[in-house]
Amino acid sequence: MKAELLLPLLGLQALLGAGTYFQTVTGFGLGMIVMGVTSGLGLAPVATVAAVVSLVTLANSACALPGKLQHIDWRAVAAAAIGILPSVVVGVLVLEYLSSSAATLLQLLLGAVILYGGLSAALKPAPLAQRSGDGTFFVSGVFGGLLSGMFGVSGPPLIFQFYRQPMKPVEIRCALILVFTVTSTVRTLFSAWQGQLDAAVCVQAAIAVPVVVIATLLGRRFPPPFSPATTRRVAFGVLIGIGASLMLPAISAWVL
């Protein structure tokens, strides 16, 4: 294989491995890490990478969740999933309806809200005194679905919601992995229905599965020795990064 083809493939596999490990130990990050870096470096077409990420997320959950299902707050996950599924479609339709300037302004506002929430939570990483009601998980799912449909980023509202709960880290991780598995399943089925699961996607996903499985097992076996407070700070730090990444392109578009 020629170097100009091999290097992007190896780079993508390395990113998938790193993102999978991060998601296994925190419950999120695979899609955000891989999509963010690959789009910035141009390692592969965005549509192809998105389809590959959805497929390997299923492999990640298949290895990360066995033996840990008893830790999942099923009511919270169900409420979030119910909110996510229809709002993804709404997000896509809203983005198609809005003008480019309105969409840019909305992206700026969403980035500012996520950045503020991440900063506020990072400064006070202690969890809430008691679990939030199921309705708040539904609302976080709705906003997560809207973000996914409009900007391809569903994580921030869900990360903020689950990491503020008085849950053990393992409970938060497993719940988020399951929620994102539901989202990835829907995306994969929709991609298949649209005929987007072509040979390139299937080959790259097949190559990535062993990498994802190994990274998942490493995450389960050798998680970083972080305290719950540190883990929450890491999660909220990622939210800060996501908020900034949404704001900067929007600001650039307005300035230029």
Swiss-Prot record:
<comment type="function">
    <text>Could be a sulfite/organosulfonate exporter with a wide substrate range, including 3-sulfolactate and 3-sulfopyruvate.</text>
</comment>
<feature type="transmembrane region" description="Helical">
    <location>
        <begin position="236"/>
        <end position="256"/>
    </location>
</feature>
<feature type="transmembrane region" description="Helical">
    <location>
        <begin position="5"/>
        <end position="25"/>
    </location>
</feature>
<keyword id="KW-1003">Cell membrane</keyword>
<dbReference type="Pfam" id="PF01925">
    <property type="entry name" value="TauE"/>
</dbReference>
<dbReference type="InterPro" id="IPR002781">
    <property type="entry name" value="TM_pro_TauE-like"/>
</dbReference>
<keyword id="KW-0997">Cell inner membrane</keyword>
<keyword id="KW-1133">Transmembrane helix</keyword>
<comment type="similarity">
    <text>Belongs to the 4-toluene sulfonate uptake permease (TSUP) (TC 2.A.102) family.</text>
</comment>
<feature type="transmembrane region" description="Helical">
    <location>
        <begin position="172"/>
        <end position="190"/>
    </location>
</feature>
<feature type="transmembrane region" description="Helical">
    <location>
        <begin position="33"/>
        <end position="53"/>
    </location>
</feature>
<protein>
    <recommendedName>
        <fullName>Probable sulfite/organosulfonate exporter TauE</fullName>
    </recommendedName>
</protein>
<dbReference type="InterPro" id="IPR052017">
    <property type="entry name" value="TSUP"/>
</dbReference>
<keyword id="KW-0812">Transmembrane</keyword>
<dbReference type="GO" id="GO:0005886">
    <property type="term" value="C:plasma membrane"/>
</dbReference>
<feature type="transmembrane region" description="Helical">
    <location>
        <begin position="199"/>
        <end position="219"/>
    </location>
</feature>
<feature type="transmembrane region" description="Helical">
    <location>
        <begin position="76"/>
        <end position="96"/>
    </location>
</feature>
<keyword id="KW-0813">Transport</keyword>
<feature type="transmembrane region" description="Helical">
    <location>
        <begin position="103"/>
        <end position="123"/>
    </location>
</feature>
<feature type="transmembrane region" description="Helical">
    <location>
        <begin position="142"/>
        <end position="162"/>
    </location>
</feature>
<keyword id="KW-0472">Membrane</keyword>
